From Swiss-Prot:
Residues 1-109 are annotated as: Disordered. It comes from Pelophylax lessonae. It comes from the Eukaryota. One of its GO terms (molecular function) is histone binding. Belongs to the pro/parathymosin family. Highly expressed in the testis. Residues 41-81 have a biased composition (Acidic residues). The keyword Nucleus applies. Its main location: nucleus. This is Prothymosin alpha. May have role in testicular activity.
Amino acid sequence: MSDTSVDASVEKTTKDLKSKDKELVEETENGKDKPANGNAENEENGEDGADNEEEEEVDEEDEEDEGEGDDDEGDEDDEADGATGKRAAEDDDEDDDVDAKKQKTDDDD
C-alpha cells in the first residue's frame, strides 16, 4: 500500500512541475519582448537600430584604416615596447630594495 501512495505523490509532483514549467516558459517568452535596459520605445521606433548601423559602418572603416600602413607603425610599436620593458626591469630592482629593508626591520624587532 505504501508503494501506491508514493506513486500517487510522485505523479502529483510531476504534474505540478510540468505546469510550473509551462508557466516559466510563458513568462520567458513574454520577457523576450522587453529590453533589459528599458528602452522599449526607442527600439520600437527604430531609433536605436539606426544608431547601431552607423556605429557598425564606422567600425568597418576603422578596421580598413588599421590594415593600411601596418609596416611603418609596427616599428614604432616595437620601440615603445622595448622602452617599457626597460622600465619594468628598473621597477623590479626598486621592489627588491624595499623588500630588503622590510627584512632588516623584521630582524630588529
